[in-house]
A protein has these predicted regions:
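Bacterial Sec-dependent N-terminal signal peptides
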Residues: 1-25, 112, 199-205
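Outer-envelope beta-barrel architecture signal
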Residues: 4, 20-22, 65-69, 110-116, ...
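A structural signal for short, well-ordered beta-strand segments
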Residues: 10, 26, 71, 118-120, ...
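Short glycine/proline- and aromatic-enriched beta-strand/turn motifs that initiate or cap beta-hairpins
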Residues: 19-65, 69, 200-205
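Residues that define the transmembrane beta-barrel architecture of outer-membrane proteins
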Residues: 20, 48-52, 75, 92-98, ...
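Flexible, solvent-exposed loop segments that connect beta-strands
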Residues: 33-46, 77-95, 126-146, 181-188, ...
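Gram-negative (and chloroplast) outer-membrane scaffold detector with strong preference
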Residues: 57-134, 193, 197-205
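Predominantly the C-terminal beta-signal and adjacent terminal strand-loop region
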Residues: 78, 144, 149-205
Length: 205
């Protein structure tokens, strides 16, 4: 699965040699796990956890003014906590994924652009651990976490132009994952609020 994602991204990279921008994005994910069988953790309220986000992305102009296509390869950490005085749980997971979406340069005031964005991320787990009262278990092969996850997202960012080199940006995204093929009674939806800092460089056509 990881090889397929890498091959797809390489194809996109060659396809986007005429892209307008290449960007490097980092940020923080604030993640909440929504368990569809919460009775498993009765008396141990779930809490949001934080993790890192890294991405390289391309931005392409469309045939419509101000509307852009975006493609990216990213690594997301989705972590969460639960516990009380008797029991404690921790989840630490990392997902590698391909992202595609749209951005619209809604407002431009001097060197500042306000950009809403929407898209979807197709991701697969590359690392997964669960800690239960100090004991650590590998969950990367558990059906709730393994396989492909579809992660639609919605967000916005503010871009500030740095002369002719490109832009810096600060943004916010919200996403909720789902796995259509999963039939288990217990499965996990991952709800994430993401803060993103980006460096954007113009690419000559």
């Amino acid at each position: 699965m990881k090889q397929k994602l890498l091959i797809l991204f390489i194809f996109l990279a060659f396809y986007t040699v005429r892209s307008q921008e290449i960007s490097f994005n980092v940020g923080t994910n604030f993640t909440q796990y929504n368990l569809k069988n919460p009775e498993t953790y009765t008396g141990t309220p779930l809490q949001s956890g934080s993790g890192s986000f890294y991405e390289i992305a391309y931005l392409l102009p469309s045939s419509k003014e101000k509307l852009m296509y975006s493609f990216g390869l990213g690594l997301n950490e989705y972590n969460a906590l639960a516990g009380n005085t008797a029991n404690s749980y921790k989840w630490n997971t990392k997902y590698l994924g391909i992202r595609t979406g749209f951005e619209y340069e809604f407002i431009e005031i001097q060197n500042i652009k306000l950009v809403p964005l929407v898209g979807i991320n197709l991701s697969s787990i590359v690392y997964g651990k669960q800690e239960i009262n100090g004991a650590i278990y590998d969950i990367s092969n558990h059906s709730e976490f393994s396989g492909l996850k579809l992660i639609p997202y919605l967000g916005f960012k503010t871009k500030y132009k740095i002369k002719d080199y490109g832009y810096i940006s600060l943004g916010y995204n919200h996403s909720v994952s789902f796995k259509p093929s999963l039939t288990n009674k217990e499965y996990v939806n991952i709800s994430t609020n993401q803060i993103v800092f980006g460096l954007h460089f113009n690419v000559n056509n």
